């Protein structure tokens, strides 16, 4: 009886606070060193801007994405020059220690001809992405799709079938719109468009399987530019088949707007257990800024507790209770130090990516938050004596005084990393 009551209490507690993420079971797709789906960690992707007119410039951009943590990097395959550059790109990445199969070729209507004209160059690709809505037009669309799938089968290359809201097959849309119009109570147009996305993706995947591409070589995506549509489409797609799924908004925009929109959609789906690989599609302000989309992907995954890439620093926003300039300097110094040391620590102290550090500005929440972190430092607040309480694994370690509080705390951080994760 007690056991039944305990189970009931646990169920009630989970219904109130929310249980842990239950991941959808999808078919595993291997791309070089990474596995998409099958319960593997969510894979981070990006796409190179390319098109600089200088191969060396494009190579450095792609290398920058890899160094930032992109595990798969998509490049446009839209010309003879672009497909002939694939071996050079792969060679450049491999020479820096990266996977020889991390480059994904993305083509449209011209991709079938390019794959068949330059088969040896294209064979360096780890994955191919095609959009069934613009791989060709009319009868040629089906022939091109079949040609790409046959190439992938011959060279044992996985394929992402990526359907986009803005480039859906017009014949399919027309049929679904006509069917909807004949209903006594037609659905809104956006609902029909959602159905068209899912239908196009599933029909294309089924066609690829009939041609001979194994299920464990297929990844699907159905991208929209609006968060609600994205969530609705992927919810329906995830219930319809077990293909591995690639998440992302097709056009998120620039800056803060793009980051918030992408995070809202991707995080929502990941918390539902939907999604095996993600890309944040931000409009870059410069070639150097392209790696921002990789950083956002990593922050989404880390904030949800799905993957850990770096030690996490928690800090309060500051208010009238804090000595803000001093507190700001402390937060900035701790963040800068951890960022600078992380690449070294990840090699010599691999568990450090799970470390949490709290930097708090006053005694209201400072001690409590500091106790919840591996390491925490709490300032007393504005107008108080300039002392800082330091906590280690939930217990008060010491109190720092004077002008070198930051330096002394960083020494404590360094010592802790080597003791805890050495």
Swiss-Prot record:
EC id: 1.17.7.3
The UniProt record lists the keyword Protease: no
InterPro entries according to UniProt: Dihydropteroate_synth-like_sf, IspG_bac, IspG_bac-typ, NO2/SO3_Rdtase_4Fe4S_sf
Catalytic activity annotation: (2E)-4-hydroxy-3-methylbut-2-enyl diphosphate + oxidized [flavodoxin] + H2O + 2 H(+) = 2-C-methyl-D-erythritol 2,4-cyclic diphosphate + reduced [flavodoxin]
Gene3D superfamilies: Dihydropteroate synthase-like (3.20.20.20), Sulfite Reductase Hemoprotein, domain 1 (3.30.413.10)
Pfam families reported for this sequence: GcpE
Family: Belongs to the IspG family.
Record function comment: Converts 2C-methyl-D-erythritol 2,4-cyclodiphosphate (ME-2,4cPP) into 1-hydroxy-2-methyl-2-(E)-butenyl 4-diphosphate.
One GO process term, biological-process aspect: terpenoid biosynthetic process
Pathway: Isoprenoid biosynthesis; isopentenyl diphosphate biosynthesis via DXP pathway; isopentenyl diphosphate from 1-deoxy-D-xylulose 5-phosphate: step 5/6
UniProt GO molecular function: 4 iron, 4 sulfur cluster binding; 4-hydroxy-3-methylbut-2-en-1-yl diphosphate synthase activity (ferredoxin); 4-hydroxy-3-methylbut-2-enyl-diphosphate synthase activity (flavodoxin); iron ion binding
Record's protein name: 4-hydroxy-3-methylbut-2-en-1-yl diphosphate synthase (flavodoxin)
Cofactor(s) in the UniProt record: [4Fe-4S] cluster
Cofactor note: Binds 1 [4Fe-4S] cluster.
UniProt keyword annotations, A-Z: 4Fe-4S, Iron, Iron-sulfur, Isoprene biosynthesis, Metal-binding, Oxidoreductase
Organism for this UniProt entry: Anaplasma marginale (strain St. Maries)
Cleavable signal peptide: none
Ranges that cross the membrane: none
Annotated [4Fe-4S] cluster binding sites: 316, 319, 362, 369
Enzyme kind, highest EC tier: oxidoreductase
